Amino acid sequence: MTAQELSIRYEVPGARRFGNYIWGSLMCLGGLGFLTIGISSYLDFPILSLVKSSNIQFFPQGLVMCFYGVLGFLLGVYIWLLILWNLGEGFNEFNLETGYVRIFRWGFPGKNRRIDLQYPIQEIQSIRVEIQEGINPKRIIYLKLRGNREIPLTRAGQPLSIQQIETQAAELAKFLQVSLEGI
């Protein structure tokens, strides 16, 4: 066996997805729009010439618009920070040469930003697949360890297709020579 055949590495994308860029931009712009209308209703002066804020009373409509504007803007900034930090990005590495499985992810900034888990391959009991269809589909591959610990291996947010999940899970189970559950 060559070194390439002795290890498998799957990259896991983080928060830098197209949808997050769109949502972050919309939340920031929408929040600023609401906040501007709320402030202009308080000042009784049109800050934006496109909207007549004189029709909006400050109490209660302008105050509520200020509240939603601040909330929307802060949520947009939070999404942009997730994109900046690339939260959740990492890899899953299965190495038969060293005899270890390594699961790495980037977390929130701070002392524990690097989430780096390493387990001996002998600890792996099986690979489990969970597939739920519906409005919010759930397609996750779990690494099942001794002691009933389960570690998710797939990314959150945009689920992979059923074919991709099944192929990846079968490839992992065959490579690690463990059973495959849930398919």
Curated annotation (Swiss-Prot):
Gene Ontology cellular component list: chloroplast thylakoid membrane; photosystem I
Protein name: Photosystem I assembly protein Ycf4
Pfam family for this entry, one: Ycf4
InterPro entries named among the record's database cross-references: PSI_Ycf4_assembly (IPR003359)
Any single GO BP term: photosynthesis
Keywords assigned by UniProt, alphabetized: Chloroplast, Membrane, Photosynthesis, Plastid, Thylakoid, Transmembrane, Transmembrane helix
Gene: ycf4
Subcellular location: Plastid, Chloroplast thylakoid membrane
Record keyword Thylakoid present: yes
Primary residence: plastid
Protein family membership: Belongs to the Ycf4 family.
UniProt key word Transmembrane helix: yes
Stated role: Seems to be required for the assembly of the photosystem I complex.
Top-level taxon in the UniProt lineage: Eukaryota
Membrane topology: Multi-pass membrane protein
Transmembrane segments: 21-43, 63-85
